[in-house]
Amino acid sequence: MRLFNWRRQAALNAMPLVKPDQVRTPWHEFWRRFRRQHMAMTAALFVILLIVVAIFARWIAPYDAENYFDYDNLNNGPSLQHWFGVDSLGRDIFSRVLVGAQISLAAGVFAVFIGAAIGTLLGLLAGYYEGWWDRLIMRICDVLFAFPGILLAIAVVAVLGSGIANVIIAVAIFSIPAFARLVRGNTLVLKQQTFIESARSIGASDMTILLRHILPGTVSSIVVFFTMRIGTSIISAASLSFLGLGAQPPTPEWGAMLNEARADMVIAPHVAVFPALAIFLTVLAFNLLGDGLRDALDPKIKG
C-alpha cells in the first residue's frame, strides 16, 4: 500500500502544473481563432479606425465640411491642398467624406440597434411561447418580408417625411423581422434542451429562463448578424439619401454626396468616386468582420 501511494504521489508530482494564466477561457479560444483570420483582422482594424474617425471627424477634417468654399478651385481634382479634390461649390471632399463617416455610420448602427432590440424581443416571445404569439409575430414578419427592404423604407420615409432620423426609423423597421426570425429559430432549439427543463423544475420563472438561459445562447448569432446588418443598413440609408429622402444638403452624408455629384460626374468624376469608395470599403469591412466573427464563435460551421 505504501508503495502504491508513493507511486501515485510521484505521478502527481510529475504532472505539469497549469498556471491560472494558462487556462483557456472561451474568450481566449475566440481570440485565438479570430486572429488567425487575416481578412477579418484587417476588417476589424479598418472598422476601429472608421469609428475613431467618425467620433473625431470634425476635429480631424482640415476644412469645415459645410461652410468652407474654395471658389478658385471649383471641381478641381485631388491635390496637396485638397486630398480628394473639390466639388462644384468649392467644398473640400476629403473633409466631407470624414464628416460623412460620422453620419453614415451612426445611421447604420442606430438603425440596426433598434431593429435588433425589437426583433430579439419578438423572436424570444414567438419562440418560447409559440401558439398565438408565434403565429401573430411571424405573420407580421411575413408581411414585412413580402416587400423589398428599400421599397418598405421608401414607403416609411414617404409617410414620416425626409430626414436622417426618419431614415433610421425606416431602416430599423425592415431589420426587425430578420432579427425576429433569427432569434425565434435559436429559441425553439434552446427551449428543448435539458438545462431549460431543469430550470423549470426548480421553479424558475419564464422571465428568468428567457434572460438567463435562452438569451445568452443566442448572443453569438445576434452579434454576427448585427455586424453584417450594419453594412446593409449603411447602403439603405445612403440609397434613401441619394434619392433625396434622407440627409438633406448641405449635410455631408455619403449618399447625399453621390446625389449632388451626379451633375458633374463627367467633368469631375472624383466628386462621386470618393464617397462611393467610402461606402464600398465600409460595407466590405463589416461583412468581412461578420464572417470572421461567425467562424471564430462557431468554428464547426466554417467551410
Swiss-Prot record:
Gene3D superfamilies: MetI-like. One of its GO terms (molecular function) is dipeptide transmembrane transporter activity. InterPro entries: BP-dependent_transpt_permease (IPR050366), MetI-like (IPR000515), MetI-like_sf (IPR035906), OppC_N (IPR025966). Pfam families: BPD_transp_1 (PF00528), OppC_N (PF12911). It is found in: Cell inner membrane. The chain crosses the membrane at residues 40-60, 105-125, 144-164, 165-185, 222-242, 266-286. PROSITE patterns: ABC_TM1. Residues 101-290 form the ABC transmembrane type-1 domain. GO terms for cellular component: plasma membrane. Keywords: Cell inner membrane, Cell membrane, Membrane, Transmembrane, Transmembrane helix, Transport. It is a multi-pass membrane protein. Part of the ABC transporter complex GsiABCD involved in glutathione import. Probably responsible for the translocation of the substrate across the membrane. Belongs to the binding-protein-dependent transport system permease family. The complex is composed of two ATP-binding proteins (GsiA), two transmembrane proteins (GsiC and GsiD) and a solute-binding protein (GsiB). PANTHER family: GLUTATHIONE TRANSPORT SYSTEM PERMEASE PROTEIN GSID, OLIGOPEPTIDE TRANSPORT SYSTEM PERMEASE PROTEIN APPC. This is Glutathione transport system permease protein GsiD. It comes from Escherichia coli O6:H1 (strain CFT073 / ATCC 700928 / UPEC). The lineage of its organism: Bacteria, Pseudomonadati, Pseudomonadota, Gammaproteobacteria, Enterobacterales.
